[in-house]
Amino acid sequence: MANGEIISGFIAPHPPHLVYGENPPQNEPKSTGGWEQLRWAYERARASIEELKPDVLLVHSPHWITSVGHHFIGVDHLQGRSVDPIFPNLFRFDYSINFDVELSEACCEEGRKAGLVTKMMRNPRFRPDYGTITTLHMIRPQWDIPVVSISANNTPYYLSMEEGLGEMDVLGKATREAILKSGKRAVLLASNTLSHWHFHEEPVPPEDMSKEHPQTKIGYEWDMRMIELMRQGRMEEVFQLLPQFIEEAFAEVKSGAFTWMHAAMQYPNLPAELHGYGTVIGTGNAVVEWNLVKAGLARVAGKAA
C-alpha cells in the first residue's frame, strides 16, 4: 500500500512585484528592492521547504482560468518567457519547470471519479500563468522540485459561492486521494492574496515603499482578523467567516485555492505559522503555513511509516 502524504500547506501569494524586488537572473526588469517584509516571509517559508524535503509541490493559481473543468498540466517540461499582462514592466521571466505528470494524471482521474469535470493539458508550448510561476519561484527558487499545476475553474464566481467552494472541497479531497496513492510527500500551495482592493496608479519607481500601504481600512482589518484566527488554530471560525471575508474584503481566496488546500489536509484545526504579511499595490498578502510534520500528522523526511 502506498504511503503518500501531505506534509504542509501554504498560503503563497503571487504578486509579481516580489520577483521584481528580488532581482533573480531569470527576470529581465531590475529593481532597487522593495516589499522586503514579504520577501523575508518567503525566505522563512523556503527554510521550511528545505527542512521538509517534499517530493512534489502542488499549486492552485487563480490566473490559469479554465471555465470548463479543472485542468492539470500533463507535459514533462515547459520552458519559455512569461510576461505579466498587467505589469509587463516588472515581470518578464524566463521559466523552466519540470512537472510530475504521473501525479497530475492521478489527481485528474480522482477528480473525475468524484464527479468533477477534469482534463489534462498536453500542449507542449503551453505558457504557465504568472501566478503559478511567481508562487513557485518565491517558495523554491532552485526550481528543483517537480510540480503539479492546477487551474482555477472559477466556479465560486459564476455559481453561488457555496456551490463553488463546495466544488473546491471535492477537488481537495480528490487531490488528497491521489497523493495518498502516489507514495509521495507533497506540499500544497494556495496561490492567493487575502484582501484584494488595490491601487490603480503605479508609483515611480514601482518599488517606492513610501507609497505602499493598505488600500482600504476594512480590507486590512479583515486580514488581521482572519490571520489571528489562523494563528490561534480556530479554523472552523475561519471557514464560517470566509464568505463574509470574501465579500467585504474582495478576498482572492474566493478563487478556491484556500478551500482546496484545507480540504486536502482534512481541515486541520492547527495553529498556523505566519511567516509574514505585507501589502503590494494596496492588496493584503500573507505567507502562512500549516506544517503537518511539526503537528505530528505527517512523517519526518526519511522516516518509514
Swiss-Prot record:
GO terms for biological process: catabolic process. It is an enzyme of class 1 (oxidoreductase). Its EC number is 1.13.11.74. Disulfide bonds: none annotated. The keyword Metal-binding applies. Fe cation binds at H14, H63, H196. It catalyses: 2-aminophenol + O2 = 2-aminomuconate 6-semialdehyde. Its cofactor is Fe(2+). One of its GO terms (molecular function) is ferrous iron binding. Heterotetramer of 2 alpha and 2 beta subunits. This is 2-aminophenol 1,6-dioxygenase beta subunit. It comes from Pseudomonas sp. The gene is amnB.
